[in-house]
A protein has these predicted regions:
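Glycine-rich, acidic/polar active-site loops that bind/position phosphate-bearing ligands
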Residues: 1
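Conserved glycine-rich FAD pyrophosphate-binding loop
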Residues: 5-136
Length: 136
């Protein structure tokens, strides 16, 4: 199975790349509608040689294959496990419900480091409590 693609005529290239950069192209417009209906938009960072990921939903592949956008109703664990299985990670980019966390859960040692850093830089806990990780 090969990944497909098309050459973009020069007169359309600038608007195409601007649409991707600004997340205003058809994929992201569709993603906004899907998110409004309860789906989630994920950004996966994986090795560029990673084959197609068998995930339910619409996908957009950028950066020579290293960045994958996925719009799906799948639970966070499914995306995180799929990305981790190929040496990558998944970040929840847009969703109505972010209770599953934006980033993958930290290991116990990393969580301890994060807590100490947060306590050092934000001793009163006023800077975005719970935004990156629910318990920080």
């Amino acid at each position: 199975h090969k990944l497909g693609g098309d050459a973009i005529p020069a007169d359309l290239a600038a608007s195409f790349w601007t649409g991707l950069r600004d997340q205003g192209d058809e994929f992201f417009i569709g993603a906004e509608r899907a998110v409004a209906g309860g789906a989630r938009l994920w950004r996966l960072s994986v090795p560029s040689t990673t084959p197609e990921l068998k995930l339910h939903g619409e996908q957009l592949i950028e950066w020579g294959g290293a960045q994958r956008w996925v719009v799906t109703p799948l639970e966070p664990r499914a995306l995180r496990e799929a990305a981790a299985a190929v040496g990558g990670h998944a970040t929840l980019f847009r969703a109505l419900d972010k209770s599953g966390g934006v980033f993958a859960p930290l290991s116990a040692p990393l969580a301890a480091i994060h807590r100490r850093l947060k306590a050092s830089f934000d001793p009163h806990g006023v800077f975005n409590p719970g935004r990156l990780y629910p318990d920080l």
